[in-house]
Amino acid sequence: MVIGIDHGYGNMKTATRCFPSGVARYDKEPIFQNNLLVYNGMYYQIGEEHKEFCAEKTQDEDYYVLTLAAIARELDGKGMNQAKVHIAAGLPLTWVATQKEDFQKYLLQNESVDFIFRNKEYHVEFAGADIYPQGFAAAFYRLQDFKGINMLVDIDRKSTRLN
């Protein structure tokens, strides 16, 4: 199963789900358990705030944990709790050349993973990950219509980028 994930600073987005890119980590089980993800003996509250800008999305485990939450939300919407998943993710165009390989390794740091999200157990095997320039998918099927010089604008929660 291919799952496309937009790892935004404001929101994580998939084909059918969108949620804030916030992660709060706890050593002990928190009292409030809305959107609680349990992974590797740690507790993560998902979506409580937005992720601060960082030039390297691999600098901490937040985007990995957010990826697990995004996959769980997609699987849950299909009535599933296990799957072999191929991730399709994006990076800003100017970062693809320098960060593509590291981001791919980051997303594939485990061959498989077991975790709990919203009190439901999940088992995910990773079949691979492809990294694309953000926004490219929106324009891909219309490329034949473009003439001359064209620009792609990526409008996010707090930023706008011209590609």
Which positions does each model-derived feature cover?
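Nucleotide/phosphate-binding catalytic cleft detector across ATP-hydrolyzing
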Residues: M1-L152
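Active-site-proximal alpha-helical scaffolds that flank and shape metal-associated catalytic sites
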Residues: V153-R157
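Conserved small/polar residues in nucleotide/adenosyl-binding loops
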Residues: T160-N163
